[in-house]
């Protein structure tokens, strides 16, 4: 889906975010005609994992993946140190891991030029950390610094490892809530982070033989949270920025169990490669069945009610984001989604892009969610209706005033009826409360 299988007059087709673009060698990695997020996806080299999985599962490269070495060479030659999207700390974090996995898994990629480039990127990332930002970006930085520093010997590599090890342990205690959810309250980013942590745990164990207790604790909590929010259709709630960009919940849970219970995976590409150190294959049991009629995630601020007749009701009645990090927040306080046998009956719009555009503005607003809306009538016909947003989202990753949650309670009555209640203070300055 990323690198399409046609070579058209020396043009190579990449497709990210439902947007197809034609590239030629040498590639313009920072082409201003592409959106920044599209360029970021190009720089991640996440798309190379599809090639790597094929190579591991079939002991041969696919036709398209023969371009991989050319693309890595092209990146090194045409991305000057510190210039362009390729040297953004987030893109470096993802690319470091992907290149390391390629080199570690495929001897034909093990050459000094690639190793030198990886070390240079690690050192740059160590000097340009996103610790000021926090959230998933900071976790991605730390995970990559840990994996990267483990590949090298020497005083600096050891210093990077020790620093990142301590910081990640500390940061997980901050970012992982008591109920196991990630503080940014996005199911898709939760699953992405969980996959990264599992991969980190496997790599640490492969190289050092150790299994950090704090890492296992975080993985267990996050896995249990993922199981608890799984819907009948196998998907997850769309609250906040939760596009379907991560692996399915069941796949992530099985990956987690393979690490926690030390069993090998079959035909899973790089995931099976990382679990080869274990002596036996494990079960592919569906871990999503142990769900309650009422799932209450008070720290995350979500409740899910599951009825015997196939209905599922999702209710968001808690804070939408950390105060300092509204990048993935939506104005969806007290939002309700309803499913019947896995099919949406009442559903929010979701997230289609991260661009600075009217679609992004709409998808973050109350109008794109199933919530009560309050507006002030315009003074004249020329003025627009002034909708009051509980979360005043703006730009593509910003938010101003944020309503405070006043009440969030729920329960089950003796007759089995489930009740949910929540309120916020967004309208109190107008003499109203919802």
Label the model's feature ranges.
Residues 25-30, 93-102, 140-148, 182-196, ...:
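Carbohydrate-binding/catalytic loop surfaces
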Residues 289-434:
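Non-catalytic C-terminal accessory modules of carbohydrate-active enzymes
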């Amino acid at each position: 889906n990323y690198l399409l299988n046609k070579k058209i007059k020396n043009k190579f087709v990449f497709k990210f975010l439902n947007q197809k673009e034609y590239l030629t060698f040498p590639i313009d990695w920072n082409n201003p005609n592409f959106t920044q997020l599209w360029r970021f996806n190009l720089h991640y080299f996440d798309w190379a994992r599809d090639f790597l999985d094929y190579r591991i599962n079939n002991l041969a490269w696919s036709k398209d993946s023969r371009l991989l070495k050319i693309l890595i060479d092209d990146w090194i030659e045409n991305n000057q140190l510190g210039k362009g999207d390729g040297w953004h700390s987030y893109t470096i974090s993802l690319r470091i891991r992907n290149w390391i996995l390629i080199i570690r898994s495929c001897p034909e990629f093990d050459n000094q030029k690639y190793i030198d480039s990886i070390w240079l990127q690690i050192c740059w990332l160590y000097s340009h950390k996103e610790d000021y930002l926090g959230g998933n970006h900071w976790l991605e930085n730390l995970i990559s610094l840990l994996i990267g520093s483990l590949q090298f010997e020497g005083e600096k590599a050891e210093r990077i490892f020790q620093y990142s090890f301590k910081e990640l342990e500390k940061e997980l205690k901050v970012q992982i809530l008591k109920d196991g959810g990630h503080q940014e309250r996005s199911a898709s980013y939760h699953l992405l982070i969980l996959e990264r942590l599992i991969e980190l745990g496997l790599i640490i164990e492969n190289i050092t033989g150790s299994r950090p207790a704090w890492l296992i604790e975080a993985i267990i909590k996050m896995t249990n949270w993922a199981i608890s929010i799984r819907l009948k259709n196998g998907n997850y709630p769309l609250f906040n920025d939760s596009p379907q960009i991560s692996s399915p919940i069941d796949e992530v849970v099985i990956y987690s169990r393979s690490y926690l219970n030390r069993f090998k995976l079959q035909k899973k590409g790089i995931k099976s490669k990382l679990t080869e150190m274990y002596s036996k294959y494990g079960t592919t049991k569906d871990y999503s069945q142990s769900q309650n009629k009422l799932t209450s995630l008070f720290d995350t601020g979500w409740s899910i009610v599951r009825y015997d007749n196939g209905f599922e009701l999702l209710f968001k009645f808690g804070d939408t984001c950390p105060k300092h990090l509204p990048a993935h927040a939506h104005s969806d306080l007290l939002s309700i989604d309803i499913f019947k046998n896995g099919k949406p009956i009442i559903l929010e719009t979701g997230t289609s892009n991260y661009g600075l555009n009217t679609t992004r503005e709409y998808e973050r607003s109350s109008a794109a969610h199933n919530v009560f809306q309050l507006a002030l009538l315009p003074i004249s016909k020329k003025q627009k209706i002034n909708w009051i947003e509980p979360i005043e989202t703006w730009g593509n990753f910003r938010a101003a005033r944020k309503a405070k949650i006043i009440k969030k309670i729920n329960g089950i009555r003796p007759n089995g009826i489930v009740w949910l209640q929540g309120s916020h203070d967004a309208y109190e300055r107008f003499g109203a409360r919802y």
